[in-house]
Amino acid sequence: MHKLVDTCDYPGFAMLVYRRGEVVYEEVTGMMDVATDQPLQKDTLVRMYSQTKPLACAALLMLFEEGKFLLDDPVSRYIPAFGKVKVFAGMNLGGMRLVDPERPMTIRHLFTHTAGLSYGFDPQHPVDRLYGQAKLIDLVSYGQMPLAEMMEQLAQLPLVNHP
């Protein structure tokens, strides 16, 4: 953390590890406000983004510890629609060329962001355009679509690469 702050890649970090009811590690380094040279404090309020990922992973790993699933279980065991997913393999005269995945998408792939799912950020990529047009995350976030339905529709979209 110190190296990232020292090289000015990030203004500051706060980290706390809590295990079995006790704080086992806590560190704060860097600036809360670089312009005013105000240091980051333990009680500084900050904006946090994309925090559902670590929370979901922590909850899932608790279930993993209980033996409820294995990391190499296929996603299709829990969401059958992912058993029919296709992978983008380029464009041809008829449009997108789709192929079967080289291996099944697993829980491990989801944890490591190697499942082949797109974020929809690149408007030049045909698969990203489809993800962006589907607006699935927005529909779920604003309560306009149940999560189960979103998963069914997500499985209809091609993967940007093989898991």
Stretches found by the model and what they are:
Residues 13, 31, 117:
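Gly/Ser/Thr-rich helix-start
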Residues 27-29:
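Short hydrophobic alpha-helix segments
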Residues 1-20:
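Beta-lactamase-like hydrolase cores
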Residues 19, 25, 65:
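A cytosolic small-molecule/anion-sensing beta-strand core signal
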Residues 34-163:
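Active-site-proximal loop and beta-strand segments within enzyme catalytic domains
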Residues 20, 32-34:
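Generic structural motif
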